[in-house]
UniProtKB/Swiss-Prot annotation:
Keyword list, A-Z: Cytoplasm, Exonuclease, Hydrolase, Nuclease
Family membership noted in the UniProt record: Belongs to the XseB family.
Organism: Leuconostoc citreum (strain KM20)
This enzyme's EC code(s): 3.1.11.6
BP GO annotations: DNA catabolic process
Lineage of the organism: Bacteria, Bacillati, Bacillota, Bacilli, Lactobacillales
Gene3D superfamilies: Exonuclease VII, small subunit
UniProt keyword Nuclease present: yes
UniProt xrefs under HAMAP family: Exonuc_7_S
Any single Pfam family the record assigns to this protein: Exonuc_VII_S
InterPro entries linked to this entry: Exonuc_VII_S (IPR003761), Exonuc_VII_ssu_sf (IPR037004)
Protein's name in the database: Exodeoxyribonuclease 7 small subunit
NCBIfam families the UniProt entry points to: PRK00977.1-2, xseB
């Protein structure tokens, strides 16, 4: 039975993949497989962040209705 990876575990795995790909010394087949794994991790991480944003919006709502959480890039 496999253990579910946390957001942080997945992010660390993605960072490792990026680091290895940036070196440029992997065989093409390995690099493509790593890239594909990385894309899958990005999609999972984005989904987790979207869910967290939706949860925060619900928690921060005064009237228990879903409201948009405005994010700024200050």
């Amino acid at each position: 039975m496999s253990e579910t990876k946390t957001f942080e575990d997945k992010l660390q795995q993605l960072e490792g993949i990026v680091s290895e790909l940036e070196k440029g010394d992997r065989p093409l087949e390995t690099a493509l497989a790593d890239f594909q794994t990385g894309v899958g991790l990005v999609k999972e991480l984005q989904g987790t962040l979207k869910h967290a944003e939706e949860t925060l919006a619900k928690v921060m709502s005064d009237d228990d209705k879903l409201t948009d959480l405005e994010l700024t890039n200050d």
